[in-house]
Amino acid sequence: MLIRRAEEKDIPRLIALLYQVHRVHANGRPDIFRTGNKKYTEEELSVLLKSEQTPIYVAVDENDYVCGYAFCVYQEICGDISLMDMKTLYIDDLCVDEAMRGCHIGTLLYEHVLAQAKRMGCYHVTLNVWCLNEPAMRFYEKCGLSPLKITMEKIL
């Protein structure tokens, strides 16, 4: 398995995987997520692929077939009155094809993101995970992540 930057040719597979992630969210919180949709359009993906601020890494097999991805966002705080200056690599989305889960592809992607964050001089790697996605929460805890802050809600 090779981890590389995503390219335009990967967009169809990224779209397919985005549908998989969205389905998990829509099934868990149909009051928030629209059924049968995805997070990004092809046009939005094309823009993200061109930006150094939003690196997308893909795990590909020996046939260059995209088995998973990690969408990232480089963030930097500088000169804030209350927060320390710091660089962050935020994982916006991490997905492994549901047919290939359990093969450590997610771990490879996560470790690649960590290595890139270190190379970029980041203080930490952050992400959000929906409480409905317990397998993802367990995976991230196994990777050594711990809660930074918690968003709470009261449905009215």
Question: Where are the regions that the model predicts?
Answer:
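Conserved active-site alpha-helix within GNAT-family acetyltransferase domains
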Residues: 107, 119, 131-149
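Conserved beta-strand in the GNAT
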Residues: 58, 65-73, 90, 95
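Conserved GNAT-fold acetyl-CoA-binding loop/helix
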Residues: 23-45
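Conserved GNAT acetyl-CoA-binding A-motif
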Residues: 118-128
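Conserved beta-strand-loop-alpha-helix junction that forms the acyl-donor binding cleft
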Residues: 126-136, 153-156
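A short helix-loop-beta-strand connector motif used in the catalytic cores of GNAT acetyltransferases and
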Residues: 43-58
